[in-house]
Design a protein with these regions (language model features):
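Predominantly soluble domains enriched in secretory-pathway, periplasmic, or organellar proteins
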Residues: 1-273
């Protein structure tokens, strides 16, 4: 995913640790009050607050189209925000309990994991219309996209698998067993590897995107819940929920090379593409 960390100190709701950066604006979801806070990435000041659907749980953006996509778990919709005007320009009905958001900027496709209906909704970014609904396994919680090979990787939390979707045909091409309760997933375009955070087994599974097989399992700290990949230095940052520690994995050796404290609730790490 090629992300780097940025810490901001602003008066927003930090109870839902998810954010996305676009055009030096950072979009942070506020699950408790059904809004998205927009923060200036240079000054760290709050720009505006945008009302979205009920219980927003995740956010991602397409830098090619300047669109931000927010999954609203409480009303089974996706809110589409124009990052140029910071206004909602579309509300898209999807499956039950939408959670993860994956984007292929080359194809202008948005992939939504529906944890409550065990499906993935495929949205055409040019029309804001769902063009396909793909059945996957139990409780798909998160998703990431390998845009170079047009494949989509879905973490199925209660089946302990990753579904691999062919983006051209919208069909399942492989199902890969991973650890206990995979909760987040990230694509490393530098080495063609997929990294899966397994919350209950306290590990990260590494999948070879060429063979769709697990080639490594890395022990980390307790309850790994978020994956962040920095392609500039080939490092994988794994946030461990239980002890607020980030495990840093060297993508070349698959070894944990550092453990870093996250901090308290007054700070928040934002992914910045």
């Amino acid at each position: 995913m090629g992300k780097k960390a940025k810490v901001v100190h602003v008066a927003v709701d930090f109870s839902s640790p998810k954010g996305k950066s676009s055009n030096n604006q950072i979009y942070m979801i506020n699950e408790d009050n059904n809004t998205v806070s927009v923060v200036d990435g240079v000054t760290d000041e709050l720009i505006t607050t945008i009302s979205v659907g009920r219980q927003p749980v995740n956010v991602n953006g397409n830098s090619s189209t300047n669109r931000i996509y927010v999954t609203n778990k409480g009303d089974d919709t996706v809110s589409v925000i124009d990052a140029g005007t910071n206004t909602v320009i579309g509300i898209i009905p999807v499956g039950g309990q939408p959670s993860g958001v994956g984007i292929n900027p080359y194809m202008d496709r948005v992939y939504i994991t529906n944890a409550g209906s065990d499906t993935v909704s495929v949205i055409d970014g040019s029309t804001n219309i769902v063009v396909a609904t793909i059945p996957v396994e139990t409780h798909p919680i998160n998703v990431d996209v390998h845009p170079y090979i047009n494949r989509i990787y879905v973490a199925n939390k209660f089946k302990n698998t990753v579904s691999v979707i062919d983006g051209l045909t919208n069909t399942i091409m492989a199902t890969v067993p991973v650890g206990d309760q995979p909760t987040d997933i990230g694509t490393n375009l530098s080495n063609n590897r997929i990294y899966v955070a397994n919350k209950n087994s306290h590990t990260v599974s590494i999948i070879d995107a060429g063979t769709n097989s697990v080639i490594g399992i890395v022990p980390v700290m307790e309850q790994p819940s978020m994956i962040d990949i920095n392609k500039s230095n080939n490092q994988i940052h794994v946030t461990n929920e239980e002890n607020s520690i980030v495990s840093v994995i060297d993508g070349a050796t698959n070894i944990v090379i550092a453990t870093l404290p996250v901090g308290d609730q007054s700070t928040y790490t934002i992914t910045d593409t």
